[in-house]
């Protein structure tokens, strides 16, 4: 095998074919496959491998070998093309062109070698991206000319033009610089007349079906960017479809063989939103022709779902394209279709879309759902600005009234499952607890919920009527299935907040009353479990109603308590989760005395606590305790709060005292698996209570604090004396107790508002118990939660804790570094927690770094560099944040800045340039640009008052010129750009450093694409900032619509009373 790696000898093609055959033969043994992979990998990576490509393509007998050759060529073109001598570029280009012509000119050869020709086309387009237009300005005329010589060759040329269009207009943003993209687009548009004439000639004269289809498919890719006059002609001020578009409408759309490809072209045209009434007649002509044809193709729209079910792939594809055409057309031209002359077609088209929405095919449903969302939000915007006149309903809304009612039915019938529902029907029809989340279903639910909210705003009475009518049908037993009940209840829960309070009250009381009645009447545990989950989901979605209706709220909570005794899988979990949700939103209602009540509900709850939680599992009890904690914390009476906390924690404290009492007599009693697990559950209960009790948890922790630390010490000592015990069940249980203790302390410190009390009364014993143990234990038994706790202490206590930070660093700094710097994989949680700790010190106690020994400070900088060079995204971005904040802090003090930047700026600059230009850290692009810009500002703005260079060894007029030279030297290692290009780029960045951050990023992004010729899938992160801004604007817009923000994400505290 190794003989193919000798590039001084002619390549043995037979041997290469044999090696490739081993790789693709399913009967080959594993060792042979591994050897073949290794040799082929080395062959592909060899810098001269590309020189063997022509030999392989001409003489290899198997297609997989030829594909490997083309992969080698593809890599050369993308990454090394600019470094090749000009004559080699021309030679490669001419060879690929001649091979494509040879293989695609003969119909039989083209068909036989179709896969190879397709791959050659892709390689050729990569060459075009490099060569056109600078070194091959005549490409378009040449490919048009060759197309007229041979129909088979013409067909393949159409494929090449289609691929080129896609590369430039669809996929270019993250592959090429903005300048290059604009140049290619302008050239393509200028020379499109030649392509247009060719397409018109083919479509008017060709008889070869495959050529016509290829032309239509290519034309489709052109239509969303070609100059407008190729689509619309204006004669004497009157606009009409161009000759090419008329061909599509009148010759090819009626023809079944070409109908689908033609409709895809018309879809591209229909999507155009030109904002000019002069062109409206053209779009009316297109929709008229379409609707006239569709009346004959689909005379009964109600049969469309059955046509799809029974149809072949062509039929299904056509219905799919119809949905795209209609939804795209109406998104761009809805208003012109609302003219009285066009209303019949508008109505018919929406009837077709409603029926397509009923097809059981998710992608089709998503297309229609997106349109229904557009239509309903568009009409909602109209209503929001509609001034009431004699008409009670806006005219536009009246126009769509019938279709919107049908859409409501479709969405209610198809409602996706929300996240909160965990009682589901499996594929065998059994009711079970869901074990994994379906993220696609959750995304679909959010889209459907948003659309239903718009639809409810448009006509809440109709929405209610449909839902209640469906509920009555199910209650009567007609058409009852779990699925129908579920989708209806999920839809009911989804419209919370979209009705006024009075409507919501009538609606919800009716729904819950009917569901409770259904629960009573239905026999069987499965039925009751499904109905219980639906009731719990609905009540959890309407906190506003519950807050306003105490008796109903009390009934709901008591019903949840009943469900907590239900053994059916998932019911207890949902009951606890729903109770937690309601407690968060309605907490004050439970601690104040309500009308006609003798005491606040919290008293009743705590008196019956042991009974209520008797059948719950430990994890469910933890959830329950968090829920009750929110209620207690909401009381404004401090004495009452303290009394409640004491009562609330009686059960866990009783168990705790029993265990501690036994330990006081015999400490060994703690050293059993059973006791360790009991302690673990008690600490978890405390942790969840601490989360919700917040500051008033201090009443509880004061009782258990010293015992808690003593247990921690006891388990630490036992593990230290028996280091291998951590592999055993007892050791694992002890470590779990320690970890949960650390989490509880972190929660307590973060949630407490009285930081001085924590510092004075709690901090010293904590540090003594935790830090010494961390420092002296073996690496395998050091808990990453210690680092997280120290981060919380520094972040929460800020200046108070400054005296203790050196002690913290002494215990964890070098100890942790020795664990995490040996490789990039071991101790992943220690890694991220350690760098979060360093960031916390940098942000809250930066002056502590001043007191570090220079060697220690260098170690700190080294570990920050090590962090941002890490391939794990979280760690890398944390390292970048630390460096950014470190530079900000250092720059505030001139003396500190001089020393720091003199010592570290150049090395840090090289490190930042390294990750900016490699392929593994693109997710940090925005932060890397920020840091680079800050470094340039440091030298440009005179933050450093002393020379960064050694005047004895080099003489620069300023620090700026010195840093520019450093950057130019680093970037000059790339063969893809010349030194003058690099110098121009660096000068531009320095000019932008103090002017515009976005321009600085854009310039850097363009240069990196030039530098590396990066592939699109690697470069999405270079645009992450822009995408995040778009998301934020969309969320802000959503928050203005009642009901659009999920009810449990709304802060209702201001209205809690």
UniProtKB/Swiss-Prot annotation:
HEAT repeats span: 239-275, 281-321, 462-501, 506-544, 551-588, 596-633, 739-776, 781-818, 855-892, 902-925, 926-965
Q: Name one GO molecular function term.
A: small GTPase binding
- PROSITE patterns given in the database record: IMPORTIN_B_NT (PS50166)
The record's subcellular locations are: Nucleus; Cytoplasm, Perinuclear region
Q: Does the keyword Hydrolase apply?
A: no
Q: Which UniProt keywords apply?
A: Cytoplasm, Nucleus, Protein transport, Repeat, Translocation, Transport
* Residues covered by the Importin N-terminal domain: 36-102
Name the coiled-coil region(s).
none
Keyword Transport (UniProt): yes
Q: Which residues cross the membrane?
A: none
The UniProt entry, under Gene3D superfamilies, shows:
Leucine-rich Repeat Variant
Q: Which Pfam families match?
A: CRM1_C (PF08767), CRM1_repeat (PF18777), CRM1_repeat_2 (PF18784), CRM1_repeat_3 (PF18787), IBN_N (PF03810), Xpo1 (PF08389)
Tell me which GO cellular component terms the UniProt record holds. cytoplasm; nucleus; perinuclear region of cytoplasm
- Tell me the Gene Ontology biological-process terms attached to this UniProt entry: protein export from nucleus; ribosomal large subunit export from nucleus; ribosomal small subunit export from nucleus
- Predominantly, its location class is nucleus
Kindly give the InterPro entries that the UniProt entry links to this protein: ARM-like, ARM-type_fold, CRM1_repeat, Exp1_repeat_2, Exportin-1/Importin-b-like, Importin-beta_N, XPO1/5, XPO1_C_dom
Q: Which SMART domains match?
A: CRM1_C, IBN_N
| SUPFAM superfamilies found in the cross-reference section | ARM repeat
What is the similarity comment for this entry? Belongs to the exportin family.
What does the annotation say about its assembly with partners? Component of a nuclear export receptor complex.
What the protein does comes down to: Mediates the nuclear export of cellular proteins (cargos) bearing a leucine-rich nuclear export signal (NES).
Indicate what this protein is called per its UniProt record.
Exportin-1
Q: Which organism is it from?
A: Dictyostelium discoideum (Social amoeba)
């Amino acid at each position: 095998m190794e003989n193919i790696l000798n590039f001084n000898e002619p390549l043995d093609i037979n041997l290469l074919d044999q090696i490739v055959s081993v790789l693709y033969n399913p009967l080959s043994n594993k060792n042979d496959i591994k050897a073949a992979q290794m040799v082929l990998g080395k062959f592909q990576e060899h810098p001269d491998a590309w020189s063997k490509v022509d030999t392989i393509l001409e003489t290899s007998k198997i297609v997989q070998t030829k594909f490997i050759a083309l992969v080698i060529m593809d890599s050369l073109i993308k990454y090394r093309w600019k470094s090749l001598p000009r004559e080699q570029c021309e030679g490669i280009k001419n060879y690929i062109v001649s091979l494509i012509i040879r293989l695609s000119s003969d119909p039989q050869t083209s068909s036989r070698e179709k896969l190879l020709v397709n791959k050659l086309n892709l390689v050729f387009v990569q060459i075009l991206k490099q060569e056109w237009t600078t070194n091959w300005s005549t490409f378009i005329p040449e490919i048009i000319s060759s197309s007229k010589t041979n129909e088979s060759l013409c067909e393949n040329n159409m494929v090449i033009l289609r691929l080129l269009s896609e590369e430039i207009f669809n996929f270019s943003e993250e592959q090429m610089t903005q300048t290059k993209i604009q140049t290619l687009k302008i050239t393509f548009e200028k020379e499109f007349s030649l392509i247009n004439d060719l397409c018109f000639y083919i479509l008017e004269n060709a008889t070869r079906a495959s050529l016509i289809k290829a032309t239509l498919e290519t034309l489709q890719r052109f239509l969303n960017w070609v100059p407008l006059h190729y689509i619309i002609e204006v004669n004497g001020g009157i606009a009409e479809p161009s000759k090419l578009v008329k061909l599509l409408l009148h010759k090819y759309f009626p023809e079944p063989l070409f109908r689908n490809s033609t409709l895809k072209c018309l879809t591209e045209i229909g999507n155009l939103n030109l904002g000019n009434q002069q062109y409206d007649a053209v779009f009316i002509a297109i929709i008229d022709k379409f609707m006239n044809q569709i009346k004959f193709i689909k005379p009964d729209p109600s049969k469309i779902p059955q046509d799809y079910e029974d149809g072949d792939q062509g039929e299904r594809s056509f219905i799919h394209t119809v949905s795209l055409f209609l939804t795209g057309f109406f998104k761009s031209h809805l208003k012109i279709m609302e003219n009285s002359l066009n209303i019949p077609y508008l109505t018919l088209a929406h009837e077709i879309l409603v029926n397509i929405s009923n097809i059981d095919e998710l992608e089709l449903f998503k297309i229609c759902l997106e349109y229904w969302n557009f239509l309903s939000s568009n009409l909602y915007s109209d209503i929001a600005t509609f001034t009431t006149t004699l008409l009670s309903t806006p005219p536009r809304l009246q126009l769509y009234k019938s279709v919107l009612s049908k859409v409501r039915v479709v969405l209610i019938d198809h409602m996706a499952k929300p996240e909160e529902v965990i009682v589901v029907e499996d594929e065998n029809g059994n009711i079970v607890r869901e074990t994994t989340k379906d993220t696609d279903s959750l995304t679909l639910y959010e889209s459907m919920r948003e659309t239903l909210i718009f639809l409810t705003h448009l006509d809440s009475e109709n929405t209610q009527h449909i839902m209640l009518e469906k509920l009555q049908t199910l209650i009567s037993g007609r058409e009852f299935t779990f699925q129908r009940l579920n989708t209806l209840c999920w839809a009911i829960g989804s419209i919370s907040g979209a009705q006024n309070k009075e409507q919501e009250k009538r609606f919800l009381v009716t729904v819950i009353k009917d569901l409770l009645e259904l629960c009573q009447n239905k026999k069987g545990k499965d039925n009751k479990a499904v109905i219980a989950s639906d009731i719990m989901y609905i009540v959890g979605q309407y906190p506003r109603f519950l807050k306003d209706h105490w008796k109903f709220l009390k009934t709901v909570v008591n019903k949840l308590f009943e469900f907590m005794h239900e053994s059916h899988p998932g019911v207890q979990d949902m009951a606890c989760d729903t109770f937690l949700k309601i407690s968060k939103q309605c907490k004050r209602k439970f601690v104040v005395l309500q009308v006609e009540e003798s005491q606040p509900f919290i008293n009743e709850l705590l008196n019956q606590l042991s009974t209520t939680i008797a059948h719950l599992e430990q994890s469910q009890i933890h959830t329950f305790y968090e829920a009750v904690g929110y209620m207690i914390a909401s009381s404004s009476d401090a004495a009452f709060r303290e009394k409640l906390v004491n009562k609330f924690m009686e059960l866990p404290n009783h168990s705790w005292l029993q265990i501690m009492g036994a330990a006081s007599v015999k400490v060994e009693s703690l050293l059993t698996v059973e006791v360790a697990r009991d302690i673990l559950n008690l600490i978890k209960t405390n942790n969840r209570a601490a989360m919700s009790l917040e500051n008033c948890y201090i009443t509880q922790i004061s009782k258990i604090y010293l015992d808690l630390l003593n247990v921690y010490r006891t388990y630490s000592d036992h593990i230290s004396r028996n280091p291998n015990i951590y592999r055993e069940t007892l050791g694992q249980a002890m470590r779990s107790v320690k970890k949960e203790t650390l989490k509880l302390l972190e929660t307590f410190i973060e949630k407490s508002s009285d930081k001085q009390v924590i510092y004075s009364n709690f901090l010293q014993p904590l540090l003594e118990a935790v830090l010494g143990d961390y420092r002296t234990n073996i690496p395998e038994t050091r808990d990453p939660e210690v680092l997280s706790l120290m981060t919380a202490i520094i972040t929460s206590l800020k200046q108070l804790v400054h005296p203790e930070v050196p002690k913290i660093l002494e215990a964890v700094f070098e100890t942790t570094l020795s664990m995490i710097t040996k490789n990039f994989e071991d101790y992943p949680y220690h890694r991220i927690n350690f760098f979060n700790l360093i960031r916390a010190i940098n942000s809250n106690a930066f002056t502590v770094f001043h007191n570090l020994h220079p060697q220690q400070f260098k170690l700190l900088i080294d570990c920050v560099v090590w962090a941002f060079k890490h391939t794990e995204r979280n760690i890398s971005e944390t390292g970048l944040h630390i460096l950014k904040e470190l530079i900000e802090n250092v720059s505030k003090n001139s003396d500190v800045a001089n020393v720091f930047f003199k010592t570290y700026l150049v090395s840090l600059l090289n490190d930042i340039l390294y990750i900016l230009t490699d392929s593994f850290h693109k997710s940090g692009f925005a932060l890397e640009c920020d840091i680079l810009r800050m470094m340039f500002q440091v030298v440009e703005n005179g933050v450093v008052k002393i020379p960064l260079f050694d005047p004895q060894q080099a003489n620069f007029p300023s620090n700026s010129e010195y840093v520019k030279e450093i950057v130019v030297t680093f970037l000059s290692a790339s063969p893809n750009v010349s030194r003058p290009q690099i110098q121009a780029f660096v000068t531009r960045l320095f000019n932008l450093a103090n002017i515009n951050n976005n321009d600085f990023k854009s310039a850097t992004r363009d240069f990196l694409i030039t530098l590396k010729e990066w592939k699109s899938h690697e470069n999405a992160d270079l645009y992450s900032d822009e995408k995040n801004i778009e998301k934020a604007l969309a969320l802000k817009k959503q928050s203005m619509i009642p009901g659009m923000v999920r009810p449990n994400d709304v802060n209702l505290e201001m209205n809690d009373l």
